[in-house]
């Protein structure tokens, strides 16, 4: 019984260590994901603003050039 208890204790320590390693890895991946999402939103915002600016130019020039 003592031997089984020691074996389970060692196995439990290994599992806790592996769990901590995976938790840290998940945290790093989450941070990377958040950074990539932020960059994507910035690019989409810039693209949307650029398109809106060119659309506004087209609308104003076509409105002023009515015959």
From Swiss-Prot:
Expressed in the adaxial epidermis of the cotyledons and leaves, and in the vascular cylinder of wild-type torpedo stage embryos. Confined in the central zone and the organizing center in the shoot apical meristem. One of its GO terms (cellular component) is nucleus. Keywords: Coiled coil, Nucleus, Transcription, Transcription regulation. Disruption phenotype: No visible phenotype during the vegetative growth. Disrupted activities of the shoot apical meristem and/or axillary meristems after the transition to reproductive growth. Zpr3 and zpr4 double mutants exhibit homeotic transformation and ectopic meristem activity. Residues 14-59 form a coiled coil. Residues 42-67 are annotated as: Disordered. Induction: Up-regulated in response to increased HD-ZIPIII activity. Up-regulated by ATHB-14. Up-regulated by REV. GO terms for biological process: adaxial/abaxial axis specification; leaf shaping; leaf vascular tissue pattern formation; meristem maintenance; negative regulation of DNA-binding transcription factor activity; regulation of meristem growth. It is found in: Nucleus. The keyword Coiled coil applies. Interacts with REV. Interacts with ATBH-8, ATBH-9, ATB-14 and ATB-15. PANTHER family: PROTEIN LITTLE ZIPPER 3, PROTEIN LITTLE ZIPPER 4. Competitive inhibitor of the HD-ZIPIII transcription factors in shoot apical meristem (SAM) development. Acts by forming non-functional heterodimers. Part of a negative feedback loop. Involved in SAM development and lateral organ patterning. Essential for proper functioning of stem cells in the SAM. This is Protein LITTLE ZIPPER 3. It comes from Arabidopsis thaliana. The lineage of its organism: Eukaryota, Viridiplantae, Streptophyta, Embryophyta, Tracheophyta.
């Amino acid at each position: 019984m003592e031997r089984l208890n020691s074996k389970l204790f060692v196995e439990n320590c290994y599992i806790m260590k592996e769990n901590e390693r995976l938790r840290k890895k998940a945290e790093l991946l989450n941070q990377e994901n958040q950074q990539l999402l932020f960059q994507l939103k910035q690019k989409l915002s810039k693209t949307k603003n650029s398109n809106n600016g060119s659309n506004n130019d087209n609308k104003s020039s076509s409105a002023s050039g009515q015959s």
